[in-house]
């Protein structure tokens, strides 16, 4: 299956880890967004929203990383451990995935991402949203080893991708002890972590370059 991605993208890194957990091989096609490769006609035919990641599986194109993750585990999972069939367990996983998209990852994009692109951080209100997102996640993880239930699921993998992104921009995760505990364990047990970190190092290079340019 063809996988259009950027190694710096948290959504792309999520899918790389999910595929690793499932034992799937992805035919990776890196798109250079800064060079407009996502706007080429052949890619727009696959994804008119021209977003990454995008997966094409036997002619079926799907984008939005959390939708891709769920598709992969439902179609290719040897069991339902990453996305249980039980309606309540599945609902909790979906809630965490939506939390990641709409709250946690969104707070990164509004506060830190502008700095990586332009050297200008978001405003103080946006930073408060980062703190609030981690406070919520810390509550979710009180007395829990995983973000949604008693085992590793796609929600852990997606949130691991997001939380690790905050690490490379020097956000102090240690202020949230439950998150820090979960994060240390998730890095050890999640398949594909090394490739996730490899992609993050590219983002870290961009972040450090922006910091240096402001000195």
Swiss-Prot record:
| Domain GST C-terminal: residue ranges | 86-207
| InterPro entries in the cross-refs | Glutathione-S-Trfase_C-like, Glutathione-S-Trfase_C_sf, Glutathione_S-Trfase_N, GST_C, Thioredoxin-like_sf
Keyword entries, A-Z: Detoxification, Transferase
Q: Describe the reaction catalysed, as an equation.
A: RX + glutathione = an S-substituted glutathione + a halide anion + H(+)
Superkingdom of the source? Eukaryota
Question: Residue limits of the GST N-terminal domain?
Answer: 1-80
Q: Which residues does glutathione bind?
A: 9, 50-52, 64-66
What EC numbers are recorded for this enzyme? 2.5.1.18
User: What CDD domains is this protein classified in?
Assistant: GST_C_Delta_Epsilon, GST_N_Delta_Epsilon
| GO CC, any one term | cytoplasm
UniProt record, GO biological process: glutathione metabolic process; response to toxic substance
Q: Name one GO molecular function term.
A: glutathione transferase activity
Name a Pfam family for this protein.
GST_N
Residues spanning the membrane: none
Similarity-based family? Belongs to the GST superfamily. Delta family.
Q: How does it assemble?
A: Homodimer.
What role does it play? Conjugation of reduced glutathione to a wide number of exogenous and endogenous hydrophobic electrophiles. May be involved in detoxification.
The identity of this protein, by name, is Glutathione S-transferase D4
């Amino acid at each position: 299956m063809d996988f259009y991605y950027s190694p710096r993208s948290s959504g792309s890194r999520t899918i790389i880890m999910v595929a690793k957990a499932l034992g799937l091989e992805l035919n990776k096609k890196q798109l250079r967004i800064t060079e407009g490769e996502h706007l080429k006609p052949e890619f727009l035919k696959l994804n008119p929203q021209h977003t990454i990641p995008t997966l094409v599986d036997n002619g079926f194109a799907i984008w939005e990383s959390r939708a891709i993750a769920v598709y992969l585990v439902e179609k290719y999972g040897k069991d339902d451990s990453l996305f249980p069939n039980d309606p309540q367990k599945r609902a909790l996983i979906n809630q965490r995935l939506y939390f990641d998209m709409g709250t946690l990852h969104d707070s990164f994009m509004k506060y830190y991402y502008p700095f990586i692109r332009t050297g200008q951080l978001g405003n103080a209100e946006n930073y408060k949203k980062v703190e609030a997102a981690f406070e919520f996640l810390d509550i979710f993880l009180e007395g829990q080893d995983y973000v949604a239930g008693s085992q590793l699921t796609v929600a852990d993998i997606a949130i691991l991708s997001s939380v690790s992104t905050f690490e490379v921009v020097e956000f102090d995760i240690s202020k949230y002890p439950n998150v820090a505990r979960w994060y240390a364990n998730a890095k050890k047990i999640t398949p594909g972590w090394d490739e996730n970190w490899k992609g993050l190092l590219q983002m870290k290079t961009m972040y450090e370059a922006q910091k240096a340019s402001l000195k």
